[in-house]
Regions:
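Outer-membrane beta-barrel "beta-signal"
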Residues: 110, 211-225
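Outer-membrane beta-barrel transmembrane domain signature
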Residues: 111-203, 223-225
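Hydrophobic, lipid-facing positions within transmembrane beta-strands of outer-membrane proteins
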Residues: 56-60, 103-107, 120, 168-174, ...
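Bacterial N-terminal signal peptides that target proteins for export
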Residues: 1-10
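Extracellular/periplasm-exposed beta-strand and loop segments of Gram-negative cell-envelope proteins
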Residues: 37-53, 80-102, 131-167, 198-212, ...
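Outer-envelope beta-barrel architecture signal
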Residues: 23-27, 68-72, 103, 116-122, ...
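Start-of-domain marker
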Residues: 25-71
Length: 225
């Protein structure tokens, strides 16, 4: 019994030592573009149409590789999310183009597979974010008959009763990594952010939930310690 226990302990120690020997840190930067749309129940807004908008996505990455196939990854990213909305019918001419700037922090598990130089990977986890600032452009048709559209070009004016600036959700991605040197690697990734918090609070009798849905295409360079 004692011999069996000793063998088990030795096996555990060997596994820990092997994992520690293979483990390594890496740090890097990423840059890309993001397309955002709103998941929204328009309800009474029958004459409004919503479309996606593109923005920037860039940030810093830290990753700890436990093995050659499993790692934990944390990021701090600047993510631009936007959308446009316009009216149809008699109110055609009214249009707003929003751009919202977020600071987001994804925390993900990363699973990789493939050869020594060229590898595929899948990331998945959660994120938290904060709505830093925004802008709105477009035009407002004041009267249905005269056809005059008043231009709009200004910073977004936050309203604490209406706007929910904290954001939380799920994030996942798939990509390819190429390691061209002992300590250097490059990645390309397609990523999806799914928000579970509305950008608007429940401040009206009729619920007006609006949820960001963001697809990001990005490339990054990493230094492996």
């Amino acid at each position: 019994m004692q011999k069996t226990s000793k063998k088990c302990m030795m096996l555990i120690v060997c596994l820990i030592a092997t994992t520690a020997a293979m483990a390594q840190w890496r740090a890097g930067v990423t840059v890309g573009a993001a397309s955002n749309s709103l998941d929204i129940d328009k309800q009474y807004q029958y004459d409004w149409r919503y479309n996606n908008r593109w923005g920037m996505d860039f940030g810093a990455v830290g990753q700890y590789d436990f093995t050659d196939w499993f790692a934990v990854r944390a990021e701090l990213n600047y993510l631009q999310r936007g959308y446009s909305q316009h009216r149809t019918g008699m109110n055609a001419g009214t249009e707003y183009k929003y751009r919202h700037n977020y600071l987001v922090m994804p925390l993900m598990a990363s699973f990789s597979f493939g050869g020594e130089k060229l590898r595929g990977f899948v990331n998945g986890g959660i994120y938290g974010g904060y709505w830093l600032s925004g802008s709105v452009k477009g035009g407002f048709k004041e009267h249905e008959d005269d056809g005059i559209v008043l231009p709009i070009d200004q910073d977004y004016d936050f309203n604490s009763t209406r706007d929910n600036r904290w954001d939380f959700g799920y994030v996942g991605g798939i990509g390819v990594e190429y390691r061209w040197a002992a300590h250097w690697a490059a990645q390309v990734e397609a990523r999806y952010y799914y928000s579970v918090t509305s950008i608007t609070k429940d401040y009206m009798l009729i619920k007006d939930g609006r949820y960001n849905s963001t697809v990001s295409l990005q490339a990054g360079v990493f230094y492996i310690f």
